[in-house]
């Protein structure tokens, strides 16, 4: 995840636009679930994955369209034959992908990526917060206890707290919210004092 956001920030610093593809929801049998991410760059190369196969291919192509239109959007894909949005797979699931356009001239987008990287370097609980209006993402920010809600004021901290879970959470409605864990604090237990264990211990 650090590599993905670092590469995005570098592209923006180099004056290049980039699209972040994020799975917001999945049901049935799908390659990856909510929270999977892939960055698509102007030359077509990608960092990260949302599951490979037809979903990733179609998403990469759609991301290149978003780079041209400069408009973020939400797109659903059906992984079952003979259905609307059928992409030729037979898994039987559904995937919703958010294509988020980042413009190198947008300081807010760059600040958001920098804030995400700061949280990824830490070891405290943190979340990505998305607000949905009319089925489209209208705002995105981060939340952690040390800094509170940043980069958006789309929801009050009091209303947000019940949605801060260890798994991705969707609150339907208009507005709706999608809350995704970014980092989760935890402990690692090392058993044994051999060469591997001693190398891992701080």
Predicted features, each with a name:
Residues 1-202:
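Segments forming oxygen-rich coordination pockets for charged ligands
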């Amino acid at each position: 995840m650090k590599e993905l956001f670092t590469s995005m920030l570098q592209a923006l610093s180099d004056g290049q636009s980039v699209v972040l593809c994020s799975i917001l929801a999945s049901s049935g049998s799908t390659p990856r679930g909510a929270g999977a991410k892939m960055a698509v760059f102007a030359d077509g190369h990608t960092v990260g994955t949302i599951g490979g196969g037809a979903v990733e291919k179609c998403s990469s192509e759609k991301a290149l369209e978003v780079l041209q239109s400069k408009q973020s959007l939400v797109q659903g894909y059906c992984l079952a034959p003979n259905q609307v949005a059928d992409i030729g797979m037979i898994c039987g699931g559904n995937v919703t992908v958010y294509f988020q356009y980042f413009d190198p001239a947008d300081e807010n987008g760059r600040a958001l990526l920098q804030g995400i990287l700061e949280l990824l370097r830490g070891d405290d609980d943190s979340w990505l917060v998305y607000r949905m209006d009319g089925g489209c993402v209208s705002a995105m920010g981060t939340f952690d206890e040390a800094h509170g809600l940043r980069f958006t004021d789309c929801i009050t901290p009091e209303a947000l707290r019940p949605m801060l879970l260890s798994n991705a959470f969707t609150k339907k409605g208009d507005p709706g919210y999608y809350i995704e864990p970014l980092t989760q604090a935890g402990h690692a237990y090392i058993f044994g004092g051999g060469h591997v264990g001693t190398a891992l211990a701080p």
